[in-house]
Amino acid sequence: MEEATRMRRNDRAMDDGWIRAFLATAPVGVVSTVDDGQPFLNSNLFVYDESRHAIYVHTARTGRTRGNIEAVERVAFTAFEMGRLLPADEALEFSVEYAGVVAFGRATVVADAEEAGEGLQLLLDKYAPQLRPGRDYRPITPDELRRTSVMRIDVSEWSGKRKEAEPDFPGAFRYREPAPGGS
């Protein structure tokens, strides 16, 4: 494991197969870029392309994310989900279930129209798998590709981790649900 993705709790580390499966279903990712030393985060729909070991996102043709990537190609990416809250007898012992991936790599704005179209189609396939181009919607056109930015993050290193408590963990509850025994 590389230095940037080294974990303190190796008992929660997940393998590459788990990471790929998690990225296939995680609904939202966050891309971290830098502008003149100022970190910037942008939440995006995303898709992991196993054949390229890359993450695709798309954004507006102009904007901070694209400008930051054009200036500094090194980025970080994360996708995560929160499970149940795990109460305890002491405040500092409260915990939470979670699963997530952190990736580092180099991002580029995809200039090749064919690859940009493939990246957008992968996004559509992930988020609307029941719909097919040419049957349920008009396929992506060259004009549409010129009106958006498709970005590819070539993953250089990644890590995944998960914490999951027993199903019968005393008092466990989901955020924004009433706690067991609460009002």
Where in the sequence are the language-model features?
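Charged, gly/pro-rich active-site loop segments
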Residues: E2-D11, M82-S183
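Short, basic/aromatic recognition patches
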Residues: E2-V30
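Short glycine/proline-enriched turns and hinge-like loops at secondary-structure junctions
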Residues: P39-F40, N68-E70, A165
